[in-house]
Amino acid sequence: MRITGGELKSRVIPANFANHVRPSTDRVRESLFNSIDHQKGIHECRVLDLFSGSGIIALEFLSRGAVEVVSIDKDKKNILHQKEIKNSWGLKSWNIAMGDAINAQKTMEKFNLSTAPFDFIFADPPYDMPNIQGLVSVLMPLLAEKGWLIIEHKPQLVLDRKSTRLNS
């Protein structure tokens, strides 16, 4: 697995994260970040990465100029893996916390991390997670006014956009 763009482009991520993690492919990440770069840009943005797994999404945001990334995952092996990369690469603007992504605000408060609005919230919950709409409702207060909420989910899932300010 490698970083697809930005300052850290082509750096390889060791694959010593938990077995149940399913990192986004290089092609998917490259498409996602090309779209973000084209429509909004990342430079100086704050990012919340939930269900962060391997940490690859956080690293892609940092590589492209995010000023701060907060990653939350409940798996200890994933957290240790992310902290190992953070320390060996000297990534001071990457904050990593072990906790439940659904209670992200409480987790950030517990670790004394800023809960100021995020420009991007990326969530990659398990595909069988019930109540994705509930997750959206919990995350909306953490999102900046013109922020992007990006959730990976089953193709057949339809979110209720009336109860949020979601566009697409």
Describe each PLM feature range.
Residues 1-165:
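Class I S-adenosyl-L-methionine-dependent methyltransferase catalytic core
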